[in-house]
Amino acid sequence: MKKILTLLISTLFATAIFAGEYPDISFKDLQSAIKAGKVAVIDVNGAKSYKKGHIPTAIDFRSNGKDLAKLLPKDKNTLVVAYCGGPGCSAYKRGAAAAEKLGYKNIKHLSAGISGWKKAGGELAKK
């Protein structure tokens, strides 16, 4: 009984730790998905940063968060990638969690963020 209880508590603890974590996507994989038109990208950096330059096709989450359901594809299996400023930034979780709440199942995170995208030579879109 004690072993079962310990196992149950360990499982619950592990689930709590990893809840809200999203797998990383590489620069190359995201770039390919954008070129193929097979990804929805969510930028959580804010309107000012978005206007200065964002990943092509990205949705400005801060300005359009309420309309996210209208802006994301109808197919809930579509790859959705959220990003913020760079490594160590956890703001991306707001956009990723919003997509998850809407029922999207294939959500990833560009941990390099916009700074890593620029460093890797990624194209920037400006609005």
State the predicted function of each range:
Residues 41-43:
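Structural scaffold elements adjacent to functional motifs in cytosolic proteins
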Residues 2-6, 15-28, 36-39, 48-82, ...:
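Rhodanese-like catalytic fold shared by cysteine-dependent sulfurtransferases
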